[in-house]
């Protein structure tokens, strides 16, 4: 329970930093354009996550990691603490999920996608792993950023 409380506190802290007031003074036409763009952004983010589900479920961890920024600036926070960098995150996944039996089949349930600023969104949801070695599940909060036209995860906080 302590880990779960910690996870929810971390998620709440990140959520409280999000500025949701960025559309309050827009004209109706500007709001409609923003909403259309936001719908397109959200669809693109969900596509990245669907591609990740497929790659993970094929034990293609490199393919799964295509959804993350390939940079030392990537931050992943989970039960093992803070991991910095794309390569270290991949190495941790390979160590923890070396075979299809360990990686299993991944399913995401997205509960919310909210705009932080023009090129960033946070996504809150749940993950489910159906595995031969026993199922696993948990919650996550990830931050996507549009980098050169591609949506990439720049921060991931997952609790299982």
Where are these regions (language model features)?
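Bacterial N-terminal signal peptides
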Residues: 5-13
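Short, low-complexity N-terminal intrinsically disordered segments enriched in polar/charged residues
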Residues: 17-67
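Short beta-strand edge/turn micro-motifs at domain boundaries
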Residues: 18, 22-23, 137-160
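Hydrophobic pocket/interface hotspot
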Residues: 52, 64-65, 73-74, 89, ...
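A mature extracytoplasmic/lumenal domain signature
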Residues: 69, 80, 112, 126-127, ...
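Structural motif
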Residues: 70, 116-117, 147
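A short gly/proline-enriched turn/hairpin at secondary-structure junctions
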Residues: 73-84, 98-101
């Amino acid at each position: 329970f302590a880990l779960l409380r910690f996870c929810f506190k971390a998620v709440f802290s990140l959520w409280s930093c999000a500025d949701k007031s960025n559309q309050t003074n827009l004209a109706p036409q500007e709001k409609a354009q923003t909403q259309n763009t936001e719908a397109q952004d959200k669809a693109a983010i969900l596509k990245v996550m669907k591609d990740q589900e497929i790659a993970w479920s094929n034990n293609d961890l490199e393919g799964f990691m295509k959804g993350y920024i390939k940079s030392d600036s990537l931050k992943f926070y989970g039960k093992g603490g803070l991991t910095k960098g794309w390569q270290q995150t991949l190495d941790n996944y390979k160590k923890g999920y070396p075979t299809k039996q360990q990686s299993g089949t991944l399913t995401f349930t997205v509960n919310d996608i909210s705009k932080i600023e023009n090129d960033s969104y946070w996504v809150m949801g749940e993950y489910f792993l159906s595995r031969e070695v026993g199922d696993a599940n948990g919650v996550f909060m990830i931050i996507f950023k549009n980098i050169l036209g591609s949506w990439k995860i720049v921060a991931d906080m997952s609790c299982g």
